[in-house]
């Protein structure tokens, strides 16, 4: 039986978190290759530590000369990312960081299983399971804890970059414990915020005085009470941050990237992967389907699972769970979803317009719950499939 009164906690990390620095770099490199060739194959991993960034993985372009040319663009892409994030500290600076590029051409054996032949649809780039989720807790149909944890850090990054609060550093984390009553989020029982600061003399109380107005401004009215616990920089000073403080890797913040633990995760990371990789494209499609089910009024809460096999085009299974909030049986929704959208890798990419350089912007503050953009960014957040789903039932 579902619980109605409880606390649920989610965390977010800022664009300057070491792992997010790596996600950003990997997706920026992906975008560069997609700008040259929409069908480019990219699997880019990044490692960052004190004074060093290492890039590795596989890339493929149809033009070998262009491939060599774009390999040479990795260094300025990395430096541009680090500069935009805001790192200019002694041991991690966009001008002086040492960059090692170990990218190489994609395996022909992988390519032959994925590429479309004359008599065969393009297959999935790997086996795997992917989940999508939506819930009518926020206008974006996202779980409230992760939505507001992201919002706080986005706001702090905004005021840092504008110069309004230049004393803040790029590295930060947030965590919210949200109180639910009758299944509805109504307040925050605790707030955890750790943020890098550039002035060594600042105390935890000083930092709280800086960030508290912005935190209050991002949360709904009435959510913070006298009983809300505040933990701002609870360990004291936080001056050394980013990859100089802790090493970073691409793909280590998969729960931050998705639903904050409110839904299952198939295990595959997103950043640095071109959309032939179903780890990414099918997870985006799953979110798209779940969001449209909720937007159609068919459920208050919806989880979708898709599964794939490498070299096989069609999904092996489509699963829907409306968590006892559905207006129709889940099996009927599953059948309808298979009718209204081509869920092969190419079908997903075509429907959502994914062969575009739209991924660097996804690397921080969540891949979901964002506004669809005019150039095709966050197309999986549209609710333009809702009527078709209802018509197919």
From Swiss-Prot:
Residue sites binding ATP per the record: 17, 171-173, 237-238, 246, 252-253, 269, 273
InterPro entries xrefs: ADOMET_SYNTHASE_CS, S-AdoMet_synt_C, S-AdoMet_synt_central, S-AdoMet_synt_N, S-AdoMet_synthetase, S-AdoMet_synthetase_sfam
Compartment(s): Cytoplasm
Broad class of the protein's primary localization: cytoplasm
Keyword line: ATP-binding, Cytoplasm, Magnesium, Metal-binding, Nucleotide-binding, One-carbon metabolism, Potassium, Transferase
Pathway recorded for this protein: Amino-acid biosynthesis; S-adenosyl-L-methionine biosynthesis; S-adenosyl-L-methionine from L-methionine: step 1/1
Positions that bind Mg(2+): 19
Cofactor: Mg(2+); K(+)
KW Calcium (keyword) present: no
Residues annotated to bind K(+): 45
Gene Ontology MF term list: ATP binding; magnesium ion binding; methionine adenosyltransferase activity
Main EC class the enzyme belongs to: transferase
Subunit and partners: Homotetramer; dimer of dimers.
Protein family: Belongs to the AdoMet synthase family.
Protein name: S-adenosylmethionine synthase
Source organism: Jannaschia sp. (strain CCS1)
UniProt gene name: metK
């Amino acid at each position: 039986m579902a619980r109605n009164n409880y606390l649920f906690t989610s965390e977010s990390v800022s664009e300057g978190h070491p792992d997010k620095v790596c996600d950003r770099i990997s997706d920026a490199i992906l975008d560069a290759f997609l700008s040259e060739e929409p069908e480019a194959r990219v699997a880019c991993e990044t490692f960052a530590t004190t004074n060093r960034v290492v890039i590795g993985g596989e890339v493929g372009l149809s033009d070998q000369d262009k491939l060599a040319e774009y390999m040479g663009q990795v260094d300025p892409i990395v430096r541009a990312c680090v500069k935009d994030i805001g790192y200019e500290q002694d041991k991690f600076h966009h001008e002086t960081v040492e960059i090692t590029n170990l990218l190489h051409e994609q395996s022909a054996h992988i390519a032959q299983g994925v590429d479309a032949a004359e008599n065969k649809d393009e297959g999935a780039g790997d086996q795997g399971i992917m989940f999508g989720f939506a819930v009518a807790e926020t206008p974006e149909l996202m779980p409230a804890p992760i939505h507001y944890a992201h919002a706080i850090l986005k706001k702090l990054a905004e005021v840092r970059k504008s110069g309004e609060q230049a004393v803040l550093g790029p590295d930060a984390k947030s965590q919210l414990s949200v109180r639910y009553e009758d299944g509805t989020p109504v307040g925050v029982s605790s707030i955890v915020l750790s943020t890098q600061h550039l002035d060594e003399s600042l105390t935890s109380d000083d930092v709280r005085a800086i960030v508290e107005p912005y935190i209050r401004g991002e949360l709904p009215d009435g959510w913070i009470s006298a009983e809300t616990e505040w933990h701002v920089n609870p360990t004291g000073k936080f001056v050394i941050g980013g990859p100089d403080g802790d090493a970073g890797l691409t793909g280590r913040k998969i729960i931050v990237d998705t639903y904050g633990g409110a839904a299952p995760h198939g295990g595959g990371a997103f950043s640095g992967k071109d959309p032939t990789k179903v780890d990414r494209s099918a997870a985006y499609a799953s979110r798209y389907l779940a969001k449209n089910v909720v937007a159609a009024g068919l459920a208050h809460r919806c989880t979708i699972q898709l599964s794939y096999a490498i070299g096989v085009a069609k999904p092996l299974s489509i699963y829907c769970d409306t968590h006892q909030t559905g207006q129709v049986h889940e099996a009927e929704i599953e059948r309808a979803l298979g009718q209204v959208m081509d869920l092969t890798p190419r079908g997903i990419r075509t429907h959502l317009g994914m062969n575009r350089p739209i991924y660097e912007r996804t690397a921080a503050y969540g891949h979901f719950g964002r506004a669809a953009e005019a150039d095709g960014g966050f197309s999986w957040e549209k609710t333009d499939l809702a009527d078709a789903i209802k018509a197919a039932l």
